Structures are given as C-alpha cells and as structure tokens.
Amino acid sequence: MAVLEILTAPDPRLRVQSKQVTDVASVQTLIDDLLDTLYATDNGIGLAAPQVGREEAIVVIDLSDNRDQPLVLINPKVVSGSNKEMGQEGCLSVPDYYADVERYTSVVVEALDREGKPLRIETSDFLAIVMQHEIDHLSGNLFIDYLSPLKQQMAMKKVKKHVKNRAR
C-alpha cells in the first residue's frame, strides 16, 4: 500500500478516458493505494484512478467523519439523474479552488463493488454529487470544465500558484 502523487490540472493524464476493469482481483492493490492516498489528504472525500495517473475505471469515496467507511466503485456509470441544482465543488486535482457546478441531486449509479459484485446505488444526498464528480474523472472531465472560460482561467491561476508554493 502506498500514498500516490495526486496529479494537478492541466496534467494531460487527467484527460485520459478510463478503461473498464475486467479483472477485479488485479486492481486490489490500486484500490488500497487510492484509499491510502485519499486518507493522506486533509480534506479529500473522493478520488478517481486518473487523478493518480492510472487508467482503470475506479473511484473511491468516503464521506464518513472518521474516514472509515470507504465506498469503492469499479466501472461506475450514472444510469439516471433528476433535479439539477447548483452546488459548490472542489477537487484534489484543482487545489485551492471552489466553484458552483450544476449537478443532479438524485442519481442512480451502477458499478461493481470491491469483490466484483454488481451494485446499484440510488441516492438523493451529497453522495449523489460526489459520485457524479468522481465518475466525471473517468471520462477525463474536471469540474472546472462546467465553468465559463474566465472562471477556468481563474482556477488555473490558483492551481499554478498552489503548485509553485508547494515546490518551495
């Protein structure tokens, strides 16, 4: 198990289309590494494999206060959604930037769990938003893609400043 480097925009690896996982046993170490990486952050609640430079269609989410209730989604897809609303989002790959994004507040997501068993999640709470955000990463999309060009520029300035400060 290892804490991996989280890529930051505009790294082109964040734009890669994820590949479906066909052998769940072969990604168990990656799942552990994704969880270790998520838990090593101060405020992360979700992480997708592309954010650490991997192409597998895997996301991990943990909304629990104690960070001890991980949700692992392999090959997830949003099969339906309703009731769009604006809500503030941030992203570990776009550090120090938050913006309002329109998302479904109610979704149905289908995926495989860590053991490879089919899973269907119907939710109308914060998890709905987080799942959409993380699943977007699997298509090479970031939350800032939903923003105006001006706001995208502002986001990238903040990211560059964050990366520069971190390098000191």
From Swiss-Prot:
Can the keyword Metal-binding be found in this entry's annotation?
yes
Q: What class of enzyme is it?
A: hydrolase
Q: Where is the active site?
A: 134
What the record notes about the co-factor is:
Binds 1 Fe(2+) ion.
Annotated residues for binding of Fe cation: 91, 133, 137
EC number per UniProt:
3.5.1.88
Q: Which reaction does it catalyse?
A: N-terminal N-formyl-L-methionyl-[peptide] + H2O = N-terminal L-methionyl-[peptide] + formate
Keywords from the named record: Hydrolase, Iron, Metal-binding, Protein biosynthesis
The biological process GO terms on file are: co-translational protein modification; translation
GO terms for molecular function, please?
metal ion binding; peptide deformylase activity
Required co-factor(s) are: Fe(2+)
Summarize the protein's role. Answer: Removes the formyl group from the N-terminal Met of newly synthesized proteins. Requires at least a dipeptide for an efficient rate of reaction. N-terminal L-methionine is a prerequisite for activity but the enzyme has broad specificity at other positions.
Q: Which family does it belong to?
A: Belongs to the polypeptide deformylase family.
- This chain belongs to the protein called Peptide deformylase 2
Q: Which organism is it from?
A: Vibrio cholerae serotype O1 (strain ATCC 39315 / El Tor Inaba N16961)
